[in-house]
A protein has these predicted regions:
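Long, well-ordered, tryptophan-enriched scaffold segments
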Residues: 2-6, 182-326
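N-terminal amphipathic, basic-rich helices that act as targeting or association modules
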Residues: 2-90, 245-267, 272-285
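Glycine/charged-rich beta-loop-alpha catalytic/anionic-binding loops adjacent to active sites
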Residues: 38-45, 104-120, 142-148, 354-368, ...
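Cofactor-binding active-site loop characterized by glycine-rich and histidine/acidic residues
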Residues: 50-171, 322, 339-340, 344-345, ...
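Non-catalytic terminal/interface segments that mediate subunit docking, oligomerization
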Residues: 74, 277, 285-398, 403-413
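Acidic, glycine-rich active-site loops and adjacent beta-strand->loop/helix elements
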Residues: 79-84, 151-158, 179-185, 287, ...
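A glycine-rich helix N-cap at a beta->alpha junction
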Residues: 93-109, 170-187, 205-208, 365, ...
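A short alpha/beta connector and helix-capping loop motif
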Residues: 158-180, 190-203, 294, 387
């Protein structure tokens, strides 16, 4: 049974619908962000949940709901573990203390829970394709609502995300993607795309040019000045990054912007929402912002159980977990057999392959959120005499069924698939059950 609802702070407690949010002066929105963070930290200390990701999207969520009006407009969150703030801003703040509890709010977006949850999820790489389908349906029906896909940079390591990007420009003229770049999935992001996004963030040349023009543009004021600013930024960026990835997919790129600057986010979203071309807005956020323990340990606070608000400490388990036993045992085996390799898909700490990574970095491979590639990569290793161990959560291993059957089993390749989190997952719910174990 759920506990009584705690009293909400003043601004947050006043929001029950879009009109209530619009009544709050823009100057007060940073205070609303503080109230949301405080409520999340206090509530999740009891229930557990995905604290770090949600602390990182507070300002983005506020800006989205100031500019767009759900449920008419559609906001689709990739994975949707970062949708807690969205729920709080759409009439569910008083229930946030029930998140991931029996008969409480789901820890993910859920269509049956609220009409504001346009699309349910739980796995990565789904938002862009689903949003594109909604855009196609809107266009076919002659309707005029906005569709916004919100995806973390880790989702761009998914093949499905790249498949969606490849289809956007030929499907619709009105499509908005927000790339929430915090450099993390569950663990630190890996691969060429992660390096590419970082290069966009840290270009000293572009940052210098943008800073030099900012004061001049602010003095101009008005709509024309705003349009000039966006055009100037786009032109400058294209000179510095002539082969900008998203331009090649037919998307107009904006950013990178400070994802914690509410006024800038609101101005930018208001500008791009009426463009007659597909756009991608790249924002940079800090996972765990507002809670020092989450900033110090982003992996731990990606998702966890109850914790002490004061220091973020969690209650330790009296006995080793199955994952810990698996990780340490594989390290012991690898000491005796140099052909053993370990593969994971952005979940080194969860599967405890971080122990293997520390002991044998050259034989450890993190493929990012690309389970299918990881399975096929393991098949290639096995075909050449190596002994690959693929450690992936059971719920994500479902994506590898074809590779397990067609590539590993049919060819009798000795790939060891090690499924973590087997069986039922009561906290995360049906999207994370290991139903096929």
């Amino acid at each position: 049974m759920n506990s009584p609802s705690p009293e909400l702070p003043e601004l947050l407690g006043s929001i029950h619908n879009h009109a209530d949010l619009m009544q709050i002066p823009e100057a007060e929105l940073p205070r609303l962000a503080e109230e949301i963070r405080s409520t999340l930290i206090q509530s999740l200390a009891v229930t557990g949940g995905h604290l770090g990701p949600n602390l990182g999207v507070v300002e983005l969520s506020i800006a989205l709901h100031r500019v767009f009006e759900t449920p008419r407009d559609k906001i689709i969150f990739d994975v949707s573990h970062q949708a807690y703030v969205h729920k709080m801003l759409t009439g569910r703040a008083e229930q946030i203390h029930t998140i991931r509890q029996y008969q409480g709010l789901s820890g993910f977006a859920k269509m049956s829970e609220s009409p504001h949850d346009s699309y349910g999820a739980g796995h990565a790489g789904t938002a862009l394709s689903a949003a594109l389908g909604m855009c196609a349906a809107r266009d076919l029906k002659g309707e005029d609502y906005h569709v916004v896909a919100v995806a973390g940079d880790a989702a761009f390591t998914c093949g499905t995300t790249l498949e969606a990007l490849n289809n956007i420009s030929q499907t619709t003229r009105r499509y908005i993607t927000i790339l929430n770049d915090n450099e993390w999935a569950i663990d630190k992001n890996v691969g060429a795309l992660a390096k590419y996004f970082n290069s966009l963030q840290t270009s000293e040349t572009f940052s210098w040019l943008r800073d030099k023009t900012a004061s001049f543009i602010e003095k101009l004021g008005g709509t024309q000045a705003k349009e000039f600013a966006f055009k100037l930024e786009g032109t400058t960026k294209n000179l510095i990054f002539p082969s900008l990835l998203f331009n090649k997919f037919g998307l107009r790129y904006f950013g990178p912007l400070n994802g914690h600057d509410i006024p800038t986010l609101i101005r930018t979203l208001n500008y791009i929402k009426d463009l007659n071309e597909p756009v991608i807005l790249h924002i940079v956020t800090q996972k765990g912002l507002g809670y020092q323990p989450a900033l110090d340990n982003p992996t731990k606070f990606h998702g966890l159980g109850s914790y002490c608000v004061h220091d973020g400490e969690t209650q330790g388990t009296p006995t080793p977990t199955f994952s810990q036993i698996f990780g340490s045992t594989l390290v012991d085996m690898a000491k005796q057999d140099e052909s053993i390799t370990a593969i994971t898909a952005a979940m080194a700490s969860g599967t405890k392959l971080d122990l293997f990574k520390e002991a044998f970095p050259r034989r450890y491979f993190d493929v990012g959120i690309a389970e299918e590639h990881g399975a096929l990569f393991a098949c290639g290793l096995a075909a050449e005499g190596m002994k690959p161990y693929v450690a992936i959560y059971s719920t994500f291993m479902q994506r590898c069924v074809d590779m397990i059957q067609h590539d590993a089993a049919l060819q009798k390749l000795p790939v060891r698939f090690c499924m973590d989190r087997a069986g039922l997952s009561p906290d995360d719910g049906p999207t994370h059950h290991g139903l096929f174990d």
